[in-house]
Amino acid sequence: MANDFLFTSESVSEGHPDKVADQISDAILDAIFTQDPRSRVAAETLTNTGLVVLAGEITTNAHVDYIQVARDTIQRIGYDNTEYGIDYKGCAVLVAYDKQSNDIAQGVDHASDDHLNTGAGDQGLMFGYACDETPELMPAPIYYAHRLVERQAQLRKDGRLPFLRPDAKSQVTMRYVDGKPHSIDTVVLSTQHSPDQSETATKMKASFTEAIIEEIIKPVLPKEWLQDTKYLINPTGRFVIGGPQGDCGLTGRKIIVDTYGGACPHGGGAFSGKDPTKVDRSAAYAARYVAKNIVAAGLARQCQIQVAYAIGVARPMNITVYTEGTGVIPDDQIAQLVQEHFDLRPKGIIQMLDLLRPIYAKTAAYGHFGREEPEFTWERTDKAAALRAAAGL
């Protein structure tokens, strides 16, 4: 990639239909883990106008009112009025869970290659990434795209912008100079709103546009990056019909929003609704943990990790490090340090990051990475000092 370029990432709010589905799936996982943290969970959700469908595979000793968990999640998000197309009180909730396949369970429970005998729950490849563009060691475009929709929800819920409704999307186009963030070229923010905020079907009131720019966008984005920035606020105009009424929502359809905004590859596996024996989730968290500690240690300015697994086998097929020429030691030496300092077997990951806890509902909106939350153990940089010392720095 050239040193001077534009790069764009997007995010969506907690009221986006796919994120409603993700949050219901993870709320169900948390409710199960509160009672039985050894459960096997693959909880999928579909949301549509007035309808929620819960399906997937769950093996547990927990007794959970799945319908109530779904309703509580929809209420927390803010869909509490039939005008919004889905209302937590009156929506239909259908439940169709099966148990985990015995064929899968035997491979996961009895891996043959290691005394840490939890095998991977499926084959697959996962990526982790970190860079020095923000203090959180995240790419700037996705980090700030998340903060925009997060603030939209905050101002909606606290009543400062009462005309906002739950569904929203953001997009940040960053200008890079010499490979580093220089300024924000364009911000797109589309937010659902009450009917009185549009002058016509294609034109919003000036007061609406001004409020979005002044109250949501400018307080979130670094002032020094707002140089001749273009603002596109509800560029198609009226956005009253939204959420599950506007589009059918499904768990696992926002995997780039959930990760790095396209700044690095994605293995294809979604996170929400999956217990940590599913390496789609746990190994992606571990790969972020590894990459973040490498950058925090000063071994590289940016770091991409790939790991891959075979179903029922504990040890990863590969651990590959790529620093795009920013490493202070060769990438293969960094990869060797990773193998020495991180246990990337599924059970090792679960122990290392303390993943058998009801911590997942919070991850299901505004990104799984780059957030300094106490539950987000994969965001710690507690291995950085040891890595730095081992590298001789």
Curated annotation (Swiss-Prot):
GO molecular function, one term: magnesium ion binding
Residues the record lists as binding K(+): 44
Cell location: Cytoplasm
Pathway: Amino-acid biosynthesis; S-adenosyl-L-methionine biosynthesis; S-adenosyl-L-methionine from L-methionine: step 1/1
Catalytic activity, as annotated: L-methionine + ATP + H2O = S-adenosyl-L-methionine + phosphate + diphosphate
Note accompanying the cofactor annotation: Binds 2 divalent ions per subunit. Binds 1 potassium ion per subunit.
Keywords on record: ATP-binding, Cytoplasm, Magnesium, Metal-binding, Nucleotide-binding, One-carbon metabolism, Potassium, Transferase
GO biological processes: one-carbon metabolic process; S-adenosylmethionine biosynthetic process
Residues that hold L-methionine according to the record: 57, 100, 247, 278
Residues reported to bind Mg(2+): 18
Major localisation: cytoplasm
The protein's required cofactors: Mg(2+); K(+)
Family: Belongs to the AdoMet synthase family.
Job description of the protein: Catalyzes the formation of S-adenosylmethionine (AdoMet) from methionine and ATP. The overall synthetic reaction is composed of two sequential steps, AdoMet formation and the subsequent tripolyphosphate hydrolysis which occurs prior to release of AdoMet from the enzyme.
HAMAP family: S_AdoMet_synth1 (MF_00086)
Self-association and partners: Homotetramer; dimer of dimers.
Record's protein name: S-adenosylmethionine synthase
Organism: Acidovorax sp. (strain JS42)
